[in-house]
């Protein structure tokens, strides 16, 4: 299991997170700009409006800050 950070919670970042979680990786989706989208994704069902699907429950959603980069990630993706 790898720890993966995806920076950008738009359609591309969110869609990329799904197969990673299905393959038992720990994925954190972080959004630096669109706080309105971040708030929607943080709700219980994690519905993504562009993809029109509920994101996996195991997906961690977090507001981006420079502190997040100090964690030990196996992979960082900018989407």
What are these model-predicted stretches?
Residues 75-78:
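N-terminal Rossmann-like NAD(P) cofactor-binding module of classical short-chain dehydrogenase/reductase
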Residues 1-54, 59-66, 70:
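NAD(P)+-binding Rossmann beta1-loop-alpha1 motif at the extreme N-terminus of oxidoreductases
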């Amino acid at each position: 299991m790898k720890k993966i950070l995806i920076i950008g919670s738009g359609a591309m970042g969110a869609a990329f997170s799904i197969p990673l979680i299905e393959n038992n990786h720990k994925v954190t989706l972080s959004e630096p700009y669109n706080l309105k989208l971040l708030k929607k994704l943080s709700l219980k069902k994690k519905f993504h409006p562009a993809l029109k699907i509920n994101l996996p429950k195991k997906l961690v959603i977090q507001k981006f800050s420079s502190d997040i980069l100090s964690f030990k990630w196996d992979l960082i993706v900018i989407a």
